[in-house]
């Protein structure tokens, strides 16, 4: 049961809460979504996983507490009173896999008649959360065509897993495969581990930094040369989400990789994906990437590569 700030009582079932939005299945009316700041209080006898702004997690059920904008969390060994807007994530414990899964699919295309150059961009992601971990699978492909031939290609696929250590601290694992003809490598496979700290974690913002190391293996585009490298990792990642009209979703990150194997070599990857919802779950936006390698594996390769594309995407929760 949810009690709205206007006094209305909504009967139904809480499906989840994240990004400042509660998903609620009302009796006889289907599923609705609305902002958490519209909730005065709520109650449910079901068990939930609760994540607060400070990173603390609880497992319990809810009851009203008689104080506006607050709720009583009922635990096995007691209870606690919570300010509703301090709850940033809420999931029923025994719900299925898909309730905790979200993602997006994107497509972009640019063409210049004067240069007869066309760029096709495809991208996508799948995200899943459970009690103590977060997993994300993402991929993208940027291919440039000129006069019916492929002029350059950049492809990436990455699997990242974050495992909760304590409050805002996570242990990160990632596996990545990529290719970039402009930077002179046919294929690179990478695996690494890092320590992650969420500096900001609230309704609209997620900001975290990561520090770690990885190992990679590269194949040159021009010859049979193969190199093995040990690298460090220093990264910063930011996500912004606004549900009110217009719905805005921004993800950006920059990762720096100092090379421990080749003296003086380092890599930098920057990425920005910004989109605005135009029709329910369909978005228009812009996608920008910039990659830099101070000492590419191929002698004739460029040291940097970048791309900008307008995109149309579909998101699902």
Describe the residue ranges of each PLM region.
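Compositionally biased alpha-helical segments
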Residues: 1-129, 156
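Transmembrane beta-strands of outer-membrane beta-barrel pores
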Residues: 109-113, 130, 141-145, 177-181, ...
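Solvent-exposed loop/turn segments connecting transmembrane beta-strands
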Residues: 110-119, 145-152, 179-187, 221-223, ...
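Outer-membrane beta-barrel "beta-signal"
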Residues: 304-317
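Transmembrane beta-barrel strands of outer-membrane/channel proteins
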Residues: 105-111, 124, 137-141, 157-159, ...
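Membrane-embedded beta-strand positions in outer-membrane beta-barrel channels/transporters
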Residues: 106, 119-123, 156-158, 170, ...
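Transmembrane beta-barrel domains of outer membrane proteins
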Residues: 125-129, 160-162, 176, 196-198, ...
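Repeated loop/turn-to-beta-strand initiation elements of outer-membrane beta-barrel proteins
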Residues: 131-137, 168-171, 203-207, 241-250, ...
């Amino acid at each position: 049961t949810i009690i709205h700030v206007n006094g209305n009582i909504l009967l139904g079932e809480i499906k989840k809460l994240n990004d400042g939005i509660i998903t609620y299945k009302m009796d006889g009316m289907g599923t609705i979504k609305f902002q958490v700041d519209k909730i005065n209080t709520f109650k449910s006898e079901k068990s939930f996983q609760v994540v607060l702004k400070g990173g603390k997690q609880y497992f319990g059920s809810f009851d009203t507490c008689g104080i506006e904008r607050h709720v009583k969390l009922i635990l096995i060994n007691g209870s606690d009173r919570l300010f509703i807007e301090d709850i940033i994530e809420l999931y029923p414990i025994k719900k299925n896999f898909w309730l905790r899964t979200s993602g997006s699919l994107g497509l972009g295309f640019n063409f210049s008649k004067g240069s007869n150059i066309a760029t096709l961009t495809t991208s996508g992601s799948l995200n899943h959360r459970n009690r103590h971990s977060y997993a994300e699978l993402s991929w993208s492909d940027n291919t440039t065509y000129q006069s019916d031939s492929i002029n350059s290609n950049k492809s990436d696929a990455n699997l990242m897993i974050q495992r909760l250590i304590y409050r805002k601290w996570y242990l990160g694992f990632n596996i990545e495969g990529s290719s970039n003809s402009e930077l002179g490598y046919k294929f690179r496979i990478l695996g690494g581990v890092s320590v992650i700290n969420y500096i900001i974690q609230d309704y609209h913002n997620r900001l975290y930094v990561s520090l770690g190391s990885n190992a990679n293996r590269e194949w040159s585009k021009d010859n049979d040369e193969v190199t093995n490298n040990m690298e460090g990792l220093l990264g910063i990642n930011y996500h912004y989400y606004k549900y009110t009209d217009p719905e805005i979703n921004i993800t950006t990150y920059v990762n720096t990789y100092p090379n421990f194997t080749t003296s003086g070599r380092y890599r930098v990857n920057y990425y920005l994906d910004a989109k605005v919802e135009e029709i329910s779950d369909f978005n228009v936006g812009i996608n920008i990437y910039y990659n830099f390698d101070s000492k590419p594996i191929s002698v004739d390769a460029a040291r940097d590569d970048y791309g900008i594309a307008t995109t149309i995407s579909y998101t699902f929760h």
